[in-house]
Curated annotation (Swiss-Prot):
Transit peptide: 1-45
Organism field: Rattus norvegicus
This protein's name: Growth hormone-inducible transmembrane protein
Functional description taken from the UniProt entry: Plays an important role in maintenance of mitochondrial morphology and in mediating either calcium or potassium/proton antiport. Mediates proton-dependent calcium efflux from mitochondrion. Also functions as an electroneutral mitochondrial proton/potassium exchanger. Required for the mitochondrial tubular network and cristae organization. Involved in apoptotic release of cytochrome c. Inhibits AFG3L2 proteolytic activity, stimulating respiration and stabilizing respiratory enzymes in actively respiring mitochondria.
Localisation: Mitochondrion inner membrane
GO biological process: apoptotic process; calcium export from the mitochondrion; calcium ion transport; inner mitochondrial membrane organization; mitochondrial calcium ion transmembrane transport; mitochondrial potassium ion transmembrane transport; negative regulation of release of cytochrome c from mitochondria
GO-annotated molecular function: calcium channel activity; calcium:proton antiporter activity
Keywords in alphabetical order: Apoptosis, Membrane, Mitochondrion, Mitochondrion inner membrane, Transit peptide, Transmembrane, Transmembrane helix
TM region positions: 84-104, 127-147, 161-181, 192-212, 215-235, 246-266, 273-293
Gene from which the chain derives: Ghitm
Subunit (UniProt): Interacts with LETM1 and AFG3L2.
């Protein structure tokens, strides 16, 4: 599942720099597919025989042409539907924040249970989020350093199969490496692998630096607000409220994963390309926001149930990786939305 989140992360940046949506569709660009109607009127043998009208259905070739033909008016409508979907998700999130944050739920949440937590549970959660902050900082530094290298930036932005394959291999390899090293037995190699993983993810984020510092700073603030609000919801909600969403989230991740891959091969101005792109971006934003709720409660649950002196030790670096990937996916989609909005105003 972590590998699928990595793929969803990698396939977004190339779309930011392609011409996408505009506010009004040009009247010169219209859908050229016409609906042919065939009227079959058999010879009349009797005065009472009625005319029979049948509609010829579209062939597979016509459906393919309709899906791939540029239609900016339809693309704009698809984009608007995606934004309304995100707005609906934001409204639900605000409602949940008010409901659980104001203590209107009768069930006990993690924030109430924190009063009776042993000190080692508090230390585990604290160290997990400290590593999360460190990962975000290392990722930002890595992205800024790579942005100063024209050769590396050209390599990351080419979009060739070699670039995509090398990026996937580096992300998956670094993720497997950092998870395979023991936190207790090999703290030195574990931290080196953690820094390597954050650096690789910074290389993936680096193409977004072309959008400019002010826009990325806004995206960072918006992401901080989203992550902070959702983390508060997860902490105030009943401790296992969102842990039952694993199966639906897995299905949604598969859909966003397939849409992210499919959008790489279709033009963004076609109906099919715009639909897949909207699912990958807007649907992905809502999906990874829900993943953040799930992963936050999963981290808290793991910190509570892992024995203090058991054979299996708590690993704060491995625990924070899923929250880290959720945060990066949210940030990249917010930055993409802000970039397309800025281009539309121009």
């Amino acid at each position: 599942m972590l590998a699928a989140r990595l793929v969803c992360l990698r396939t977004l940046p190339s779309r930011v720099f392609q011409p996408t949506f505009i506010t009004k569709a040009s009247p010169l660009v219209k859908n050229s597919i016409t609906k042919n109607q065939w009227l079959l009127t058999p010879s009349r043998e009797y005065a009472t025989k009625t005319r029979i009208r049948t509609h010829r259905g579209k062939t597979g070739q016509e459906l393919k042409e309709a899906a791939l033909e540029p239609s900016l008016e339809k693309v704009f409508k698809i984009d608007q539907m995606g934004k309304w979907f995100v707005a609906g998700g934001a409204a639900v999130g605000l409602g949940a924040l008010c409901y659980y944050g104001l203590g209107m739920s009768n069930e006990i949440g993690a924030i109430e249970k924190a009063v009776i937590w042993p000190q080692y549970v508090k230390d585990r959660i604290h160290s997990t989020y400290m590593y999360l902050a460190g990962s975000i900082g290392l990722t930002a530094l890595s992205a800024l350093a790579l942005a100063r290298s024209p050769a590396l930036m050209n390599f990351m932005m080419t979009g060739s199969w070699m670039t995509i394959g090398a990026t996937f291999a580096a992300m998956i390899g670094a993720g497997m490496l950092v998870q395979s090293i023991s936190y207790e037995q090999s703290p030195g190699p574990k931290h080196l692998a953690w820094m390597l993983h954050s650096g690789v993810m910074g290389a993936v984020v680096a193409p977004l630096t072309i959008l400019g510092g002010p826009l990325l700073l806004r995206a960072a603030w918006y992401t901080a607000g989203i992550v902070g609000g959702l983390s508060t919801v997860a902490m105030c909600a009943p401790s296992e409220k969102f842990l039952n969403m694993g199966a639906p989230l897995g299905v949604g991740l598969g859909l966003v994963f397939a849409s992210s891959l499919g959008s790489m091969f279709l033009p963004p101005t076609s109906v099919a390309g715009a639909t897949l792109y909207s699912v990958a971006m807007y649907g992905g934003l809502v999906l990874f926001s829900m993943f953040l709720l799930y992963d936050t409660q999963k981290v808290v649950k793991r910190a509570e149930i892992t024995p203090a002196y058991g054979a299996q030790k708590y690993d704060p670096i491995n625990s924070m990786l899923t929250i880290y990937m959720d945060t990066l996916n949210i940030f990249m989609r917010v930055a993409t939305m802000l970039a397309t909005g800025s281009n539309r105003k121009k």
